[in-house]
Amino acid sequence: MNSQNIRIRLKAFDHRILDTSTREIVSTAKRTGANVRGPIPLPTRIEKFTVNRGPHIDKKSREQFEMRTHKRLLDIVDPTPQTVDALMKLDLSAGVDVEIKL
């Protein structure tokens, strides 16, 4: 028996927006009769930037900034046609990057 999975990978800088988007996707998938595995939290990517505080000399005075990219993974097992249609029509937050693999 051949089962089809939909793998959804979400990325965002703000983890609260990411969690609300995953909740929306999970509730939509369960409402249409599909099984959902996840959300699985993936490792957070942290990019650090170090800059001088002043425009002139004084190399000892520096400031660090970081940018965190939070990620989640969802697997939808045996999706129905209603599930696929509902996921395509779903409107998520602007700060969330969605990758869908069939």
From Swiss-Prot:
Gene3D superfamilies: Ribosomal protein S10 domain. InterPro entries: Ribosomal_uS10 (IPR001848), Ribosomal_uS10_CS (IPR018268), Ribosomal_uS10_dom (IPR027486), Ribosomal_uS10_dom_sf (IPR036838). One of its GO terms (cellular component) is ribosome. It comes from the Bacteria. One of its GO terms (molecular function) is structural constituent of ribosome. One of its GO terms (biological process) is translation. The keyword Ribonucleoprotein applies. Belongs to the universal ribosomal protein uS10 family. This is Small ribosomal subunit protein uS10.
